[in-house]
Amino acid sequence: MAYVDTNTLISYYFDEEKLHEISVRIFNVLRAMRKKIYISSLTLVELYSAIARNLSRYRLPPHYMVLDEERKIHALVKDILEHLKPILVDDEPKLELFDKSSVFHIYKKTINYVATLKLRSLDLLHITYAIEFAKRGLVDMFVTLDKELINRKQVLESLGLKVMDFS
């Protein structure tokens, strides 16, 4: 069971991505290991965002040409999800107290990793989701193409998250 971040999904699906070949190798290994793929709601938001920002550079099949931009984006995300069949894990709509305010549980957990990991906020959120999914027995590894995350492999593994490294 593997938590796969957005850049790996995008790189796999689109031939134009510079890390396409590596991501194909990653998914071949995951299939050979019979690993289920897990994603978070953050991954879903990032998929939409990444496709919207890069839509003009992707070579799309002819049947996409009749769609307006918004429908193309939705269709591509749907196609990625249908093709890779990741399991989207529900968010816990739990609130926690933080400095006299209520914040979502996942954000509070993320704040706890800030000093240790020193990553960008979305990367921190992905890591937190993966750690939380691991605690629930859903995943046992984190898959990324992000060098900054791979460079923190030892720290992540000390937090209980095995990192798949294909660099």
What annotation goes with each model-predicted range?
Residues 49-62, 84-89, 128-134:
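Short regulatory "switch" loops immediately downstream of catalytic or recognition motifs
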Residues 15, 75-117, 124-128:
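Acidic catalytic patch
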Residues 1-72, 165-167:
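Short, well-structured N-terminal submotif of metal-dependent ribonuclease cores
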Residues 4, 38-39, 121-124, 144:
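Short beta-strand scaffold positions
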Residues 38, 96-98, 162-164:
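General small-molecule cofactor/ligand-binding pocket signal
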Residues 1, 113-116, 127-167:
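Acidic, PIN/NYN-like endoribonuclease modules and their adjacent C-terminal/linker elements
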Residues 8, 43, 126, 148-149:
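Alpha-helix capping/helix-boundary segments
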